[in-house]
C-alpha cells in the first residue's frame, strides 16, 4: 500500500509553475521582479565563488599534506613558552 504512494511526486508542471509565478508577482509586485532576479543572481554567483575558493583550499591542503598543521602547532607552543617567560620576568 505505502509503496504506491510517491513521497516526492516530481518537478512541478506548467499549471503549478504559473500559480507560483502569480504568487511571486502578487507578493513582490511586477516592478520589483527584475531587481529581485538580479540580486538573487548576484547571491548565487558569490556563493559559487566561495564554494570554488573552499574547494581550491581543500585541494591545496590535500596536496600539501599535514606538514602545515604540525608546524603551526609548534609555532603555537613556542608562542605559549614566550608568553610564560615574559610573565615570569615581571
Swiss-Prot record:
UniProt-listed Pfam families: TatA_B_E (PF02416)
InterPro entries the UniProt entry points to: TatA/B/E, TatA/E
Principal location listed in the UniProt entry: membrane
Biological processes per GO annotation: protein transport by the Tat complex
Topological type in the membrane: Single-pass membrane protein
Subcellular location: Cell membrane; Cytoplasm
Ranges of compositional bias, category Basic and acidic residues: 46-63
Function, in words: Part of the twin-arginine translocation (Tat) system that transports large folded proteins containing a characteristic twin-arginine motif in their signal peptide across membranes. TatA could form the protein-conducting channel of the Tat system.
Miscellaneous field: H.volcanii possesses two TatA translocases: TatAo and TatAt. Each may interact with specific Tat substrates.
Protein's name according to its UniProt entry: Sec-independent protein translocase protein TatAo
Record organism: Haloferax volcanii (strain ATCC 29605 / DSM 3757 / JCM 8879 / NBRC 14742 / NCIMB 2012 / VKM B-1768 / DS2) (Halobacterium volcanii)
Gene name, Swiss-Prot/TrEMBL: tatAo
Amino acid at each position: 500500500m505505502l509503496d504506491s504512494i510517491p513521497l516526492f511526486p516530481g518537478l512541478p508542471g506548467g499549471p503549478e509553475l504559473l500559480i507560483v509565478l502569480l504568487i511571486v508577482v502578487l507578493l513582490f509586485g511586477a516592478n520589483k521582479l527584475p531587481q529581485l532576479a538580479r540580486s538573487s543572481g548576484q547571491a548565487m554567483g558569490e556563493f559559487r565563488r566561495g564554494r570554488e575558493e573552499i574547494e581550491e583550499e581543500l585541494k591545496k591542503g590535500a596536496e600539501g599534506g599535514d606538514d602545515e598543521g604540525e608546524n603551526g602547532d609548534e609555532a603555537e607552543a613556542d608562542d605559549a613558552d614566550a608568553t610564560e617567560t615574559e610573565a615570569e620576568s615581571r
